[in-house]
UniProtKB/Swiss-Prot annotation:
The keyword Lyase applies. It holds the Pfam family CpeS. Keywords: Lyase. InterPro entries: Calycin (IPR012674), CpcS/CpeS (IPR018536). This is Chromophore lyase CpcS/CpeS 1. Its EC number is 4.-.-.-. Covalently attaches a chromophore to Cys residue(s) of phycobiliproteins. The keyword Lyase applies. GO terms for molecular function: lyase activity. It is an enzyme of class 4 (lyase). It comes from the Bacteria.
Amino acid sequence: MNIIDFFELSAGEWFSQRTIHNLVSGELQAGKSEVNVEILEKTDPTLINLCEQNQVDSSVTKLIGVKISWNGTNNKGQVKDVGSRMLIIIPNFDDLNQGQLLQNRGNGNSPKISGRYIMGSDDVLMLTTESEGLYVEERFWYLIPNLRLRTSVVNRPQGFSLASFCSEIRRVKS
């Protein structure tokens, strides 16, 4: 599987359950979300805007734009978690399995976040991003086409660290 196949398989509606561990305090949180993954056209204004902010030509053939939206709760339903982010995947010219990652939250006017991706020979996607003192490493993989797993580790200055595990089940329409 290459990066294009991975994101095409990701398109659709998902139910996500997650557990988040604060590695410093030991606090544990659980949450659930409805997640929608949409592949963007290269003519999408938000995609073009993020590309322009990063001096990237949005007409690059292999470029992939993805919008991820979620609506859920954390901590036994006490904290609402609603948002979206856009990812732009820019494969290396000579290797679709590695490349640059651009992302933002929401409407395209938020601070840009950049990083790298590697699509492993084991079909595990690893995203690494850094911005404003934040370092995030995420891993995604499919057990079957309708069941995706995700882990992440978030590190901030002053020793703040989180680790999470998510299982995501595709909503299949009858």
